[in-house]
Amino acid sequence: MKHKDSEHNIILQSVFRATLIAMIVADLAEVIAAGIDGMLTGRYLGANSLAAFGIAKPFYSITGILSAVLSSGAMTVSSHWIGSGDVDKTRQIFSLTCFLGVVLSVTAAGLGIIFINPFTRILGANADLFFEVRRYLLGLLLGVPAIVMGNVLTIFLQLEGKRANVTLSVFATIVVNLGGDAFNIFYLKGDMFGMGLATSASYYAALIILLYSFIKQDSMMRFRFRDIDYAMTGELLSKGMPKATRRICNVFRPMIINHTVIMIGGSIAMSALSVQHSSSDFLELLGTCLADVVVLMCGIYYGERNREEIANTLSMSFRYIMFGVMSVTAFAFLGARLIASFYLGSNIQAIEAAIPCIKLYALKLPFLAFNEIYMGYFQAIGDTRYSHAMSVLHRFVYVCASVVILGSIFGIIGVWAAFPVSEILFTITILILAALHERHLPRKIHDMLFLPASFGINPENRFHRFIRSREDAVSTSKEAYNFCAEKKIIHKRSMLVALCIEELGINAVTYGFSRKNQIAEVSITAERDDLKLRFCDNGRLFDLKQWFELFHSDDLASHIGIRMLFGLANDISYMNTMNTNNVIIKL
């Protein structure tokens, strides 16, 4: 048992770590672009310009709503079609998503430019900051199509397993944005419009790299107008809406906070808040990406009704909070002056105002990570209404109420204190809800799953093994046959399941394993008349084209066990996501 636990930890840790890294890389472009703008603006254009930068920050949340709906919807819908081997429908959703992305993003950019004056006022710009906020927004609005389409194309590149292209696009974003900002400040002696324009240019540079990935011959995705099926639009948008709820809250929350800060503390306080906004993009990154990992991994395990793996995934995310997020918290609290100086240069008054803001903000990071993980978890277990309601409470109601109440009582320090207070209150809310659900105080992770007692698979109906070698593949195949026989599965079906496991295992070991810690996981569940086989390995990713060609090979002896089992299957799914190959066969 100890050996199997060790094997289990290897693949779970490998999947979790690889997925987390992929999420962080994918989010880095926007984070770094905003961070570079904030740092250079504060140091070289002054405190007022930095305040304008902070006021305009909801712009990223607004564009994020559109990006979230399209990218999340495309991921949900197309992943099933890729897994089922339906490349034509996958290309249809790709073409539809790209078409909608271009039309909606260009429309949004045009409306933003036409109505830029009221848009600037809605964001909270007063008379002193109106001109600079307006100029910055104008530069950013020109880049909306590139921002939206970059997010959309990134999703499809991840589905194809081309993470190197995503990394290259992030690198291009950093280089072009930094170079453009420096050119604007030191050569053109420009203003906030130039800063926004440089950011837009960096997104277009990244978009060009992403587009090139789809032009190459090895790409499965091709945009064709004839592939667009407008009837899929409703499904695409509805599947993407849950993720958009948090983005919507991110738009309206800063408006209330900005108004409160300016009213209580003026431009100096707003520049302090802008430093917090700019640094938060980096400091919150680990926590928010942990939440994204939980959405994916717990969503898979929820579909399998695998209570134990759900608990293990949550436990692993909490360990990252203890060692990762707590380290970030210590850095932000102890390095508050360094962070403020990084953004504000030698502006002593602004630096002193920013230090307490950063320190109190740092205290919220562990609670924020915990809360974000549970927001993602509620989405993963399919409780959409609960996820929406809790997101509104967390992202809007608690923090805005805390800012207004504590700010009116304690002044600007009360506003800064509202950030950790609101997160602590929401953490307490989750614990109370867990206690009500379990009818006792939560004492272990299984008390925090918010799942009915009947959820899960009887251990007697589940077969679970690991494969490291060809010998393991053969022995696992025999054990799988015995398991199926015990469950009174007909002989032919039991033989094909065993043969399929042996062929998948030997293929993974022979062609996919090149490192010490690579391993394959096999699970079979047998309930009533349903039989499900899941094969997962963390070896070299399958080539999707070869996967689809497997169904049409002229060599009838090639992969005979796999092909014959596929002929009996009710549903076949394959995905090379989260740095693993996943084959799911339902009989």
Language-model features: locations:
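Interfacial/gating helices of multi-pass transporter permease domains
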Residues: 41-61, 128-132, 192-193, 197, ...
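Small-residue-rich hydrophobic transmembrane alpha-helices
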Residues: 50-110, 150-166, 272-330, 370-390
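Short alpha-helical transmembrane segments in multi-pass integral membrane proteins
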Residues: 1-23, 78-143, 187-241, 298-364, ...
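Flexible, glycine-/charge-rich segments associated with ATP-binding catalytic modules
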Residues: 447-465, 566-587
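Glycine-rich/acidic phosphate-handling loop/turn and adjacent ATP-lid/helix
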Residues: 533-559
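Conserved short strand/loop->alpha-helix "switch" segment adjacent to the catalytic nucleotide/phosphoryl-transfer site
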Residues: 478-502
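Transmembrane helical elements of multi-pass membrane transporters/channels
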Residues: 18-37, 139, 150, 173, ...
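Short runs within selected transmembrane alpha-helices of multi-pass transporters and secretion channels
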Residues: 71, 140-159, 166-177, 195-210, ...
